[in-house]
From Swiss-Prot:
This is Probable U6 snRNA-associated Sm-like protein LSm1. Probably involved with other LSm subunits in the general process of degradation of mRNAs. LSm subunits form a heteromer with a donut shape. The lineage of its organism: Eukaryota, Amoebozoa, Evosea, Eumycetozoa, Dictyostelia. It is found in: Cytoplasm; Cytoplasm, P-body. Residues 1-75 form the Sm domain. Gene3D superfamilies: 2.30.30.100. It comes from the Eukaryota. PROSITE patterns: SM (PS52002). Belongs to the snRNP Sm proteins family. InterPro entries: Lsm1, LSM_dom_sf, PTHR15588, Sm, Sm_dom_euk/arc. GO terms for biological process: deadenylation-dependent decapping of nuclear-transcribed mRNA; mRNA catabolic process; mRNA processing; RNA splicing. The gene is lsm1.
Length: 129
């Protein structure tokens, strides 16, 4: 039994990128750099108990941006009883507000740490490499 991207061709996958975006589509091909092409692709955003999809069609994803990918069980793709589908505009606004809230919380944590005498000289990000 072999493992790798070859086993995922023609299957419906979810792909999570380094920036947190999530794409769902049918993988049609890949190359030696793990670049992949998805067909019938949607971008999905989750905020709280809500989600929204944006149709993108045929979509190319660079392999170095992929954090994780996996096959989607069609029967359990979205547990719609637990998640509420809302419009793309509503979800992007909610996601922006959530991002601002997280940034404010991080600033507060840093301020409290600094006032307590704890400092972090440098915070490394994967994009720094």
């Amino acid at each position: 039994m072999s493992s790798g991207l070859g086993d995922e061709v023609d299957k419906k996958l979810i792909v999570v990128l380094r920036d947190g975006r999530k794409f769902i589509g049918i993988m049609r091909t890949f190359d030696q750099f793990a670049n992949i092409v998805l067909q019938d692709t949607i971008e999905r955003i989750y905020v709280g108990d809500c989600y929204s999809d944006k149709n993108l069609g045929l979509f190319f994803i660079r392999g170095d941006n992929v954090v994780i990918l996996g096959e989607i069980d069609p029967d359990k793709e979205v547990q719609e009883k637990k998640l509420k589908k809302i419009s793309w505009d509503e979800i992007t606004k909610a996601a922006a507000l959530e991002k601002i809230k997280k940034e404010e919380e991080e600033q507060l944590k840093r301020r409290i740490m600094t006032e307590s005498g704890l400092t972090i000289d440098s915070i490394l990000n994967i994009d720094d490499f």
